[in-house]
Curated annotation (Swiss-Prot):
SUPFAM superfamilies: N-terminal domain of the delta subunit of the F1F0-ATP synthase (SSF47928). It holds the Pfam family OSCP. The lineage of its organism: Bacteria, Pseudomonadati, Thermodesulfobacteriota, Desulfuromonadia, Geobacterales. InterPro entries: ATP_synth_OSCP/delta_N_sf, ATPase_OSCP/dsu. This is ATP synthase subunit delta. Keywords: ATP synthesis, Cell inner membrane, Cell membrane, CF(1), Hydrogen ion transport, Ion transport, Membrane, Transport. Transmembrane segments: none annotated. The keyword Ribonucleoprotein does not apply. Its main location: membrane. It comes from Trichlorobacter lovleyi (strain ATCC BAA-1151 / DSM 17278 / SZ). F(1)F(0) ATP synthase produces ATP from ADP in the presence of a proton or sodium gradient. F-type ATPases consist of two structural domains, F(1) containing the extramembraneous catalytic core and F(0) containing the membrane proton channel, linked together by a central stalk and a peripheral stalk. During catalysis, ATP synthesis in the catalytic domain of F(1) is coupled via a rotary mechanism of the central stalk subunits to proton translocation. F-type ATPases have 2 components, F(1) - the catalytic core - and F(0) - the membrane proton channel. F(1) has five subunits: alpha(3), beta(3), gamma(1), delta(1), epsilon(1). F(0) has three main subunits: a(1), b(2) and c(10-14). The alpha and beta chains form an alternating ring which encloses part of the gamma chain. F(1) is attached to F(0) by a central stalk formed by the gamma and epsilon chains, while a peripheral stalk is formed by the delta and b chains.
Length: 180
């Protein structure tokens, strides 16, 4: 819970800065790359959690990473601030929260569209268009296949699910027949 509050505070500040400078998308890309490097490198994560490394050593490690990733000055300063405040371990949560806040700021939703079979581009675009019309927001869909649905589509937008799968319809019929 504490990490969520911390992540939200840092992410909110960075979204505000990105919005002022019209750099929300660039910040997002840079943060994803840096977070991906941390996620894929256990030694790097361990170094920032290890008290044997001094603050200066941790800053130098971060500077080297920033240089290799060619981060913008603002993201570089943000990452160095995380080192100063000993919050690098919160980076995954900060990036996740940043993405959510940036999407809210930009009027973007990222629904999860689950189908029993793979969709072609025209089908995805049709669903995307319907969702954009319904929500009034830009839709960036994520599509996955779950053959257990048998047929139909389940669309998850945040906490709301639109379930028109055959699996759910069969379950409802089963419940009705059971109740008699």
């Amino acid at each position: 819970m504490i990490n969520n509050a911390i992540a939200r505070r840092y992410a909110k500040a960075l979204v505000q800065l990105g919005s002022e400078k019209d750099l929300i998308d660039r910040f997002s890309q840079e943060l994803k790359v840096v977070s991906g490097v941390f996620a894929g490198n256990a030694e790097l994560r361990a170094a920032f959690g290890n008290p044997a490394f001094t603050a200066d050593q941790k800053k130098q490690i971060m500077r080297d990473l920033i240089a290799r990733m060619q981060c913008s000055e603002l993201v570089a300063n943000f990452l160095l601030l995380l080192v100063d405040k000993n919050r690098v371990v919160c980076l995954p949560e900060i990036v996740e929260t940043y993405e959510k806040l940036a999407d809210e700021q930009s009027g973007v939703i990222r629904p999860m569209i689950t189908t029993a079979f793979a969709l072609d581009d025209s089908q995805v675009n049709a669903i995307k268009g319907a969702l954009e019309q319904k929500t009034g927001k830009k839709v960036v869909p994520q599509v996955k296949v779950d053959q257990s649905l048998i047929g139909g589509v389940v669309t998850q937008i945040g906490d709301i699910a639109y379930d028109s799968s055959v699996k759910t319809q069969l379950a409802r019929i089963h419940d009705i027949l059971q109740k008699g």
